[in-house]
Amino acid sequence: MTLRIVTPGSNTSLIQPGFSLLHFSSHVFYLGQKGWPKRSCPTGVFLLDLKNNDLKLRPATFTNDSCYLPPLRHPAVCSFSASQGGEITQYLIHGGKTPNNEISHKLYIMTMAFPVNKRFSLCCSEKDLAGDVPEARYGHSMNVVFSRGKNAVVMFGGRSYMPLNQRTTENWNNVIDCEPLVYLIDLQFGCSTSFNLRELQDGLSFHVSLARNDTVYIFGGHSLGNNFRPPNVYKIKVDLPLGSPAVSCTVINSKISFSSSIVTQTSPDEFVIVGGYESDSQKRLICNGVFLDDETIDIQEIETPDWTGEIKHSKTWFGADMGKGAVLFGIPVDNKHQSTDCSFFFYVLNFGDNDPALQTCSQGSTEEQEDSMPLEDSEEFTFNRDGNIFDEDTYNEDDEDDESVTGYWIKCCPDCDMDRNTWEPFYSTELNKPSMIFCSKDGGHWVHSQCMDLSETMLKYLSQNNIKYFCNEHVEVARGVQTPEKTPPVKKTSLKSVRKRTTINRLSAVKKSFLRRLFE
């Protein structure tokens, strides 16, 4: 058993809690980046490159027929092989949270395409389900079981938002435990069936699950409803006859309780549980070995790694299984090390015999990576079957927006008091994010419509008529730089015309003499 710190390299700033690792043979892929994918790597999936204690993430390539896979935090991930104990050929990915905190309900299947030009490509497809379709959730588990020559996927646990008919402005963003149902999914026909077992009374999430033959073992986890970590092992046995499947559950008292732990496999029948939490404020620093056979399970405490001072004093930690007995986990950087580019320290804990640095390699040789030329900004990035369009070192971390600055919960003005935990919908068009409007001052910036005291009528008028908007701080500046309108000159009455005398018609001498004689 070895524990060593690794040096963060390119793109490691995209690593965040809730990520997942997919290991195909000797290749490990990272899923669940921070924020939405950028143009430099639109796939959002990276190859984990660990050499000489340097950790790097290199953009992965997908085939042309792949569907889009969003970055997902805390999804249920499980490997799938065509035969029991065979080589991993597929990964199943269900649920998880997107960067917008929306919870996914989709099921994806990830496979490794044949290598072309010494590079590996991935293929992602979406699987439609029918029957008792599981609701959108995260923090749950999936496992593949084999029975009577057939296989099925067992899904259990997780959290989700409250049903729409129960959500109000006060609890709009609150999550609850999903119902303690066991879902049995037939991948061949896309059918899903739910089972309500009396041994499972409370919802459970962030637990550990292991599968052997036709049995799934569920350890630990956290029940949000009663804030409880049960010290039980739930043994779920699946029978797949020609007719309807049968599912049963047995409760075993293990006397250990934890949540958010990581499990890694060291041999076909041996596993190690490491990390996690014993309570909301207490990390779990001990390790347990799990030994499985056909009918029994044995859990023992094993040797604990020599944790560093940073790990012991850190309040939080997170990680994922790298495969073959290795675990990658990180802890937040304290205030003394804020000068570093990365927000986390990363460690590799290895319970196996092989060095994970030798297991994980990058796409292509080291010489190809160092000598490769970066793509120009004008070039378009596409999904390519040949795997030549992406260069591993072209991802620019500066392109990654800081969610604290560009998200919906920014401080848009001095009087802004938007808080993710206390915000309530104000406009009829809002759902789970506040409405924002773009201010056109200089380069432009986003502000909250509610902070600008905009009425819903005015907000609709501005958006429908495509009118430039200036926020309260910049509206006076915007008026000052506007070109003055041309006004016609004021028409002034001439003083000469005012003083002009009226015209007097003078009579001729003939008319005067005629009028004189007439009146005489």
Curated annotation (Swiss-Prot):
It is found in: Nucleus. Coiled coil: none annotated. GO terms for biological process: B cell differentiation; T cell differentiation in thymus; V(D)J recombination. Core component of the RAG complex, a multiprotein complex that mediates the DNA cleavage phase during V(D)J recombination. V(D)J recombination assembles a diverse repertoire of immunoglobulin and T-cell receptor genes in developing B and T lymphocytes through rearrangement of different V (variable), in some cases D (diversity), and J (joining) gene segments. Zn(2+) 1 binds at residues 412, 416, 448, 451. This is V(D)J recombination-activating protein 2. A zinc finger (PHD-type) spans 415-477. Belongs to the RAG2 family. Keywords: Chromatin regulator, DNA recombination, Metal-binding, Nucleus, Zinc, Zinc-finger. GO terms for cellular component: DNA recombinase complex; nucleus. PANTHER family: V D J RECOMBINATION-ACTIVATING PROTEIN 2, V(D)J RECOMBINATION-ACTIVATING PROTEIN 2. One of its GO terms (molecular function) is phosphatidylinositol-4,5-bisphosphate binding. The atypical PHD-type zinc finger recognizes and binds histone H3 trimethylated on 'Lys-4' (H3K4me3). The atypical PHD-type zinc finger also binds various phosphoinositides. Expressed within the thymus, liver and spleen in juvenile frogs, and within the thymus and bone marrow of adults. A lower level expression is seen in the ovaries. Component of the RAG complex composed of core components rag1 and rag2. Zn(2+) 2 binds at residues 439, 445, 471, 474. Transmembrane segments: none annotated.
